Curated annotation (Swiss-Prot):
Single GO MF descriptor: structural constituent of ribosome
GO CC field: cytosolic small ribosomal subunit
Gene Ontology terms: biological process: translation
HAMAP family, per database record: Ribosomal_uS17_B
Organism: Aggregatibacter actinomycetemcomitans
Superkingdom, taxonomy of origin: Bacteria
Protein name: Small ribosomal subunit protein uS17
Keyword entries, A-Z: Ribonucleoprotein, Ribosomal protein, RNA-binding, rRNA-binding
Length: 85
């Protein structure tokens, strides 16, 4: 059995929790009738053991065993730090 572990990239939209954050995954879907590409976002709750990710960071996350009711993803790495303006 060769199960591939899912890994995705997204932006951190909330980091107010301890050892957790929310990441928004954006994808483009073609409208079934009109053919226009529409942006769809999915929010995932991610486990962050060391509180590395901050608001606005681009992060890579992967699927894991369920950690809580809503958390089943863990942080792999911070791809790009947020620019503080």
């Amino acid at each position: 059995m060769t199960d591939k572990i899912r890994s995705v990239q997204g932006r951190v939209v909330s980091d107010k929790m301890e050892k957790s954050f929310v990441v928004a995954i954006e994808r483009k879907v073609k409208h079934p009738l009109y053919g226009k590409f529409i942006r769809r976002t999915t929010k995932l709750h991610v486990h962050d053991e060391n509180n590395e990710a901050k608001l606005g960071d681009l992060v890579e996350v992967r699927e894991c065993r369920p950690i809580s009711k809503t958390k089943s993803w863990t942080l792999v790495r911070v791809v790009e730090k947020a620019v503080i303006a």
